[in-house]
Amino acid sequence: MTMKTHLDLEQRKQLHGTAYVEQYLQKSPKRLRDLVDRMNIEITSDIVDFGCGDALIIEYLKDVVNSYQGVDFSPEFIRVANRRKMALHAKNVKFQCESIPDFSRHHKNSFDIGFALDLSEHVYDDEWQNIVTAMHDCLRPGGQFYLHTPNADFLLEKMKQHDFLIKQFPEHISVRNAKSNSHFLSVAGFENIDVKFIPHYNILRGLHPMSKLPLIGKFFQARLFITAKKPIN
């Protein structure tokens, strides 16, 4: 679901400025550890992190992959990410501050694994397809892609959509459901698309057992973890 007011690129960059970066640093690292554990990663893997943010995830990846490259359009996030890289002495880590389509033009067929964690909800539909296709192009044939994002069918997201008791985060301009996210991946050329509904990473994770209930279960499926593959041929 897309917000009613359409923000231009500069407005969105301002939303992801210093204040947002500082707020983001307070998020629980456990959610990233849980997501990494869901990925099929090997020591020989070359990884690209689309919308890498502050790159807290490199703490869990730098010693178990061949290389990691993060790309983000926010200079503030890239500065924080580079400071983290230096503090961790992560020599196999690199960051690039640019758009994903621009990054893709000079990184085609370059990575075994790509992921976009909590990125898609920050991008409008009319831009997202181009970005998903660019991410697809960055992967080598047979490469694996992982997407993590809020689920638009989750009860709390429904409430935000209608401004009922709780408002949507201003940065979350396009929260989608499983069907919509899968469609974008399919159009880009991905195959073997698999959707898993996983718990929220805060106190709301306590609602997840209710996701098994008939008829109303979908309203308690907080997060999406989607796996897809770039065809070999």
Predicted regions and their residues:
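Conserved N-terminal segment of class I S-adenosyl-L-methionine
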Residues: 1-109, 113-117, 129-132, 206-208, ...
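Conserved beta-strand signature within the Rossmann-like core of class I S-adenosyl-L-methionine
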Residues: 143-149
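Short alpha-helix
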Residues: 173-188
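A short glycine-rich, Lys/Arg-flanked "PGG" loop and its adjoining helix->strand segment in the class I
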Residues: 129-141
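Short, glycine-/aromatic-enriched active-site segment of Class I SAM-dependent methyltransferases
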Residues: 150-172
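A C-terminal cap/extension of S-adenosyl-L-methionine-dependent methyltransferases
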Residues: 146, 160-162, 183, 193-233
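Short catalytic micro-motifs in class I SAM-dependent methyltransferases
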Residues: 118-122
